[in-house]
Amino acid sequence: MKSNNEIINIDHNVLIWARKRLNLDINEVAHRIKKKPSIITNWENGKSKPSLSQLETLAYDVYKVPLATFFLPEPPDEPPINQQFRTIPDSEITRLPYKFMLLVKEAQFYQEALKELFDGRNPVDKPIFKSITNLRGGSIQNAATLVRERLTINKEKQSKFKDSTEAFKYYRNILEVNGVFVFQQTLKNYCRGYSLFDTEFPIIIVNSSETTDTGKNFTLFHELSHLLYSMGGISNEYTYQSTNQIEISCNKIASLILVNNNELVQELKEYDIDLNDIKDNQL
């Protein structure tokens, strides 16, 4: 049995990988384990080695990985997170907070659990993300209409919701019936939600900290739109204000899924309201 104080010979590149995957810098790691930054630097450049006890602290308290990870001959082949969030520049990706990155890793675990539970195949024969594709260059209105039809979202259905909470429950359930699993995490002010694409088990995460479900409903369909583009996304202030064409399209599609333009215009006419008199933030 190895002593906790025994120095462990590991590949220092695994230490670098474990830190960078969570957007941590050396000073932050040093602070969390109460060591000088120079000690972490020496571990990562191979000049010195951590003890078993120090590795346990890194694994369980900081990097949140199994201890056995550090005994691998090389870093795991884990796709970088920017392959999911392709509409966000790397400069923004590297600024995502450590605690948010931990939540993303937790969500990736959910995906792996789903794959194991369903033997690697989505339980829905024709999930929505395989039925509605090729959004690039297509009509945004048409995409929204297809989603509304597939999910049975219409004026009659929506008028029966007593509030946004009941609407959210319906939207979440109907998405899962159509092959997209939805989870909630306490995301605080990191973002309103995000999505992770997978060819069989894409998932949407919404912020349980939202004060109302109205925001959750928009987030659901913004992130669904990302999945229909075969990519993940993040719903935050950066992406809402982004000039990236896909982000703009996702915002528009989400809005049109929730409120059908033709139905809105017809209802306004019934109340003798001129659409030109309504500001965007009133819609």
Task: Specify the residue positions occupied by each region the protein language model found.
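Short juxta-domain linker segments that transition from a proline/glycine-rich
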Residues: 1-283
